[in-house]
């Protein structure tokens, strides 16, 4: 089977490409002209140069391909709204259209649990939970991922394109900073986290996520499938930091979230004035971050028979020292 990976030079896409190469799967990657891909080419990866917004380049990338992993996205916080929508929404639309034209057997699209809105504290969020009703109150990344997810669902239903949408949480692993919390910072070995230590923490170790992506690629049937995925539904901030402390001897202090919420209107006003691009902090955004959000993953565990192979402590151990914490 010939496979194409968009975003194959990024964190998740790069890890996926390495996995496929280890499995001796022929891989093609769509890479931006500005990104170095010498190492991939030296390992036998076919590299197609082009932007997601270039229909000709995308068509070349998926021509003759059976399976496409669409992982490419603009994920950083800086930038204008148009930049996020060009890559994450119009880019996704272009990839799906090209895959339909090329007769691709299946597309696995990497979305995000960021598409969901406010819920009652502790309420289970599954694949039937509505999208966020107030996307304009979110940062540009979240707005664009929500719009792209909606577009992908609509496209698959209208055209019959065999599509699997994966909605992971916070992805980490070797080469990427270990997460601390949705509202957090660190100074040396000391971590400072705002919010209750009992809040659920939706994490995905990169290799566990790739296991699920490969299972999704081999699903029977052509119908649209949607999967929420986090490694441990029951993981809390307290248990995560306790486990992390056992590995790296770090110390974590928790602070109440209400002062952050109280300051949100002022901070958002300041950020609207300052030239900080896509960085936004709104009351709505902070309320989501301080809610206890339980992501229900029964569907992916039952239908794909997926379970994380790398446990939390081992995943932290593998990630320690590969990147500065953030």
Regions found by a protein language model. Give the residues of each.
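N-terminal Rossmann NAD(P)H-binding glycine-rich loop of SDR-like oxidoreductase domains
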Residues: 3-23
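NAD(P)H-binding glycine-rich loop region in Rossmannoid oxidoreductase-like domains
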Residues: 35-41, 45-90, 98, 102
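Conserved Rossmann-fold NAD(P)-dependent oxidoreductase catalytic core, especially the SDR/UDP-sugar
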Residues: 90, 94-140
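Flexible, glycine-rich beta-alpha linker
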Residues: 116, 140, 161-181
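Active-site Tyr-X1-5-Lys
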Residues: 136-164
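Substrate-positioning beta->alpha
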Residues: 147-148, 176-181, 194-217, 224-228
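Mid/C-terminal beta-alpha module of Rossmann-like enzyme folds, strongest
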Residues: 215-280, 297, 317-318
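Amphipathic terminal alpha-helices
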Residues: 295-303, 307-326
